[in-house]
Curated annotation (Swiss-Prot):
The twin Cx2C motifs are involved in the recognition by the mitochondrial CHCHD4/MIA40-GFER/ERV1 disulfide relay system. The formation of 2 disulfide bonds in the Cx2C motifs through dithiol/disulfide exchange reactions effectively traps the protein in the mitochondrial intermembrane space. Its cofactor is [2Fe-2S] cluster; [4Fe-4S] cluster. Its main location: cytoplasm. It comes from Rattus norvegicus. This is Anamorsin.
Amino acid sequence: MAEFGISPGQLVAVFCDKSSSEEALKKLVGRVQGLTGSEGQVFVENITQLLQSAHKESSFDVILSGIVPGSTSLHSPEALADMARILRPGGCLFLKEPVETTGVNNDKIKTASKLCSALTLSGLVEIKELQREALSPEEAQSMQEHLGYHSDSLLSVHVTGKKPNFEVGSSSQLKLLHKKSSSVKPVVDPATAKLWTLSANDMEDDSMDLIDSDELLDPEDLKKPDPASLKAPSCGEGKKRKACKNCTCGLAEELEKEQSKAQSSQPKSACGNCYLGDAFRCANCPYLGMPAFKPGEQVLLSSSNLQDA
């Protein structure tokens, strides 16, 4: 038992299965209790009840699974993950499991490399294969009875793994090295500094001609232009004047003023019912005799209608 590294006062879990003999289990537990002492504790449980037990996280210092002589326990990924969960940070797991030594693709029995990969995926580190040994006649018979599997290429492998010194999801502060700013200024090449430096004395050199921006404009350029002169030659030609799209010459504003002036000269209804028809119009309504129209629709009256009104 010295290879398991069990110390006095530690909490140890021993997992077995139905293939483990009671005498061998009692003998193993007695030896472990002798190592843990009165301050420690040894917990024994069937591996098939591990997931249902719902142990608290970080409960055990050492876990022994399948170590009972004659045991042929097979560890599922879920069982390995739960063992890693209930191990304390820095705790160790020791297990023994039958493995295939050939490259036969088998869903029941893993190879030694797949067993180590499963331990790594469960969250353990420092996975090591301690030893391999042939199955005893009792173990071979147990494989045949409980698992219905028989093969001449089976071996029993002992593997160990360690839980990292931190819990999953824990956080710690990183000590970042901040680079101190140097008080010594970098050396600058004088030739390079002179190349990229423009002196004020160079600006006052008589050989440099500066352009006066005021001399670029003539007196005619400073006069405000007449809006009529900005119109295009073909803008508004024809019987019906029409402003161009995005007009900038002022024709659009001019047409808008003329339209608003024409609308203001039209007579306005005092009752507001003129558009409904003659049945709703007054006796002196200028729209008498005209059909009904939509509210807001522009209706032009002839001079005779205006005179009658």
